[in-house]
Each structure stands twice: as structure tokens, then as C-alpha cells.
Amino acid sequence: MPFRVSRRAAALLGVACAAAATFALAAHAAPPIKVTSQTPTDGPIRYTVKVTSSRYGNAQQTRTLRSGDTDDFTWRTTPPGGPVPAVAGCPGYASLPLDANGAMVRQTQVRLAPIVAANGTANVQLSFRAQAPRGTRTVTSGGQSIKCPDVAEHTEVVRFSMPTTGAPKTVKLADGTQITISALR
């Protein structure tokens, strides 16, 4: 007996095939989805700053910054021979890093000012300033001889480019201090 299809079943089959073809064409016509793992260049970036110095000590800290922001990293540490007493008559007394007892300690300051380009490269300006006592010296103040800290200090500004992929960038300053920075989105 031959297989017969009713008109109604044939019509439904035709509608179903037409609908399936329409949906298939619509699926192929949709725009592709672009997946990217990059974040906007002005988004927060984690910067880790590590200072290695025989004179000013070692320190490390991580902070989050946006492109165009600046941040100051400041570390105070006890020098190898201990803090050096300072009195108000010492030259530059107001700018000396002092502990709670009024004795000079080591201080390292790093100001980081990154600007991230569209390609993800950070153009960084780094300002470095450090002070440390290296013993004492005798000075005359108000007609009296007083012992003051013999201050070693270094100030330097460097500019450089670095990736924001977490790869470290090391900068060597004129006094031998090394600063290693990494930036990660």
C-alpha cells in the first residue's frame, strides 16, 4: 500500500520547513560577538613599587591607581646604627624625618604619576626623594656647637614606559638605588 500524506499534514510540514529555514538564516545573519579581555585604559591598575637601597633601606607596597592620578609612597625605617638625635638648631631641622623622640630616621618617598595610552602602555613619571643619617657632625648655631645628623639625601625624577601586564620594570637611579615597578590591570 503506498504511503499517502494528507493535504493538511503536507501544509504543516511545509510551514515547519519554512520556519526552520528562516530561523537558520537569522542565526547566520547575527553580528559576531567580540570577546576581549582588555579593560579600559582609565580603569584601576594595581601598581607595586619596590625600593632596594643600601643607604635608604628596602621597602615595597601595592596600591591601585587610575590613569592620570598620582600617589605618594612614603616609608620610614630605622637606620642600621639607630636613629640619630637632632635638635631644633640643626640645619634643615624642619624637613628632617624624625621619630617620636625627635631623632632622625631614614625616609624614602616615591611619587608615581602614570598615564596609560590606548595600547595599554603606561607612561610613568617617578619622583624619588630619600634622606638618611650617616652619623653626626658638629655645627655652630646661635654661638654654640651642637651635634646634628650628617644627612645623606638624593632626589631624582625619571620618566619611562612600561606594560600594564604585570611584567616588572626596574629603574636604577644615579645613587645606585633600584626601583622595581609592576602594573597589572
Residue ranges and their predicted role:
Residues P2-V15:
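Bacterial N-terminal signal peptides that target proteins for export
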Residues M1-P2, T22:
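A general, composition-driven signal for non-globular sequence regions
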